[in-house]
């Protein structure tokens, strides 16, 4: 399997060329290319458009720079991450703007030769003052994801839904959210593919989000089975969404390996560990990345070993 890492905390720290060089030297085959960090939260929730996506040139200059660096160092684009949140309560302009950037991101994904994009479900992240019923949320997402089908078909891209969480911002308590129930997640994928008439939707399983909700990673993997086509691999302390390296938090990684073995997962081993990338001085980034790539190779060996070891 190909080993991949997200680029935030690497290319923005080292520069695009040096960042891709470091990714290659560490032993990675692919990158999880992030487009989610260029739309400021304050702009999103107030319905303001951002130049990066809407001036007609900045996004494409950035994508072209990344494409050239990736080609230079032999790095593939394993998946792209679209902007979020995809629903802003009481701000239809903000919701429309973000959903438009998702379509632009699908176009960018196709241009990069990448066949997968991760798009968060549309949901209200506030557990204290929820603005949607479960039925309203489900319909909202079916309509939203269905609207992406023409762009997905045009660019030959699979849209990956992701398991989410929400929080009571007053008490800091974390609650289940859209696609954190694996039966619901499977229902989304199956219904959307039926609407599309082909397999245009899959699932990106986020290990850290499972851990925040005390969900067993093995059970979730087996429940989704071959609907899982991408991964966000990271660890945490079980309380905060830290996005740290595997084995530095409390997730049971043997259960993770067992689950992927059981479903015969053959996709990319992708790390979403930006929470730790920026904690290291840039001089130590190469060493940290090498450890992470070695962890990916270890997972690959264990998942694909002839017998469990």
Give residue ranges: language-model regions:
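N-terminal small/glycine-rich loop or linker at the start of catalytic domains
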Residues: 1-6, 78-88, 124-129
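Histidine-acidic metal/acid-base catalytic patches
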Residues: 1-4, 9-27, 37, 99, ...
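Conserved beta-strand positions in the central sheet of alpha/beta enzyme cores
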Residues: 32, 79, 118, 160, ...
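Glycine-rich, proline-tolerant flexible connector loops at the mouths of alpha/beta enzymes
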Residues: 32-66
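Conserved radical SAM core fold
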Residues: 35-45, 85-87, 124-127, 166-168, ...
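Catalytic-core regions built around general acid/base machinery
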Residues: 52, 56-72, 147-152, 220, ...
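Well-ordered, non-membrane alpha-helical segments in soluble/globular domains
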Residues: 56-64, 139-145, 182, 289-293
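Active-site acidic/histidine proton-transfer and metal-coordination neighborhood
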Residues: 71-72, 86-202, 209-212
């Amino acid at each position: 399997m190909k080993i991949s890492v997200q680029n935030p905390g690497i290319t923005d720290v080292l520069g695009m060329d040096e960042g891709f060089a470091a990714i290659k030297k560490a032993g990675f085959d692919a990158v999880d290319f992030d487009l989610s960090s260029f739309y400021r939260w304050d702009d999103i929730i107030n319905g303001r458009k951002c130049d990066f996506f809407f001036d007609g040139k900045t996004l494409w200059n950035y994508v072209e720079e990344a494409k050239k660096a990736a080609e230079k160092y032999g790095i593939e684009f394993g998946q792209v991450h679209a902007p979020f949140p995809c629903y802003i309560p009481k701000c239809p302009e903000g919701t429309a703007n973000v959903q438009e950037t998702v379509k632009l991101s699908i176009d960018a994904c196709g241009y990069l030769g990448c066949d997968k994009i991760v798009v968060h479900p549309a949901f209200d992240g506030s557990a204290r003052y929820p603005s949607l019923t479960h039925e309203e949320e489900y319909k909202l997402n079916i309509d939203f994801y269905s609207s992406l089908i023409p762009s997905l078909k045009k660019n030959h891209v699979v849209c990956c839904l992701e398991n989410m969480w929400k929080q009571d911002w007053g008490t800091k308590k974390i609650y289940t959210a859209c696609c954190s129930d694996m039966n619901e997640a499977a229902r989304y994928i199956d219904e959307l593919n039926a609407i599309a008439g082909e397999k245009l939707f899959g699932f990106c399983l986020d290990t850290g989000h499972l851990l925040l909700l005390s969900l067993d990673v093995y059970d979730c993997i087996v429940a989704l089975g071959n609907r899982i086509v991408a991964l966000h691999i990271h660890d945490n302390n079980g309380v905060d969404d830290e996005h740290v390296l595997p084995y530095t938090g409390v997730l049971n990684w043997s259960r993770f390996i067992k689950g992927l073995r059981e479903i015969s997962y053959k996709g990319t081993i992708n790390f979403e560990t930006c929470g730790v990338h920026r904690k290291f001085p840039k001089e130590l980034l190469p060493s940290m990345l090498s450890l992470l790539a070695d962890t990916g190779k270890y997972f690959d060996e264990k998942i694909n070993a002839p017998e469990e070891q």
